[in-house]
């Protein structure tokens, strides 16, 4: 299985994804991710704009999914913006 950490950016079928699963969980062939898109309608706090590799991309939080690790290729990290990602997941789950 590919080594991925929380807030890593990985490519999956041509789409950039942020891994949001805790590293404290036991290894699994699947991992929870959220797509990073450049043309997604942003809702305040739910869809923060993140910078990756000189691009400004929207975290499409409602499109949260699980994908097979084997299909992911790590291309970077947004760990420095991890608070925005965590807040977005909190808003998705709790509404606040």
Can you say where each PLM-predicted feature lies in the sequence?
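Compact nucleic-acid interaction/catalytic patches
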Residues: 3-49
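C-terminal terminal-subdomain/extension
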Residues: 52-96
């Amino acid at each position: 299985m590919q080594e991925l950490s929380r807030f890593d950016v990985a490519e999956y079928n041509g789409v950039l994804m942020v891994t949001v699963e805790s590293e404290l969980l036991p290894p699994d062939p699947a991992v929870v991710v959220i797509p990073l898109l450049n043309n997604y309608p942003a809702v305040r706090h739910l869809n923060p704009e993140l910078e990756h590799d000189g691009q400004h991309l929207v975290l499409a939080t409602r499109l949260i999914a699980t994908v097979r690790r084997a299909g992911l290729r790590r291309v970077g990290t947004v760990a420095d913006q991890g608070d925005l990602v965590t807040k977005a997941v909190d808003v998705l789950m709790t509404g606040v």
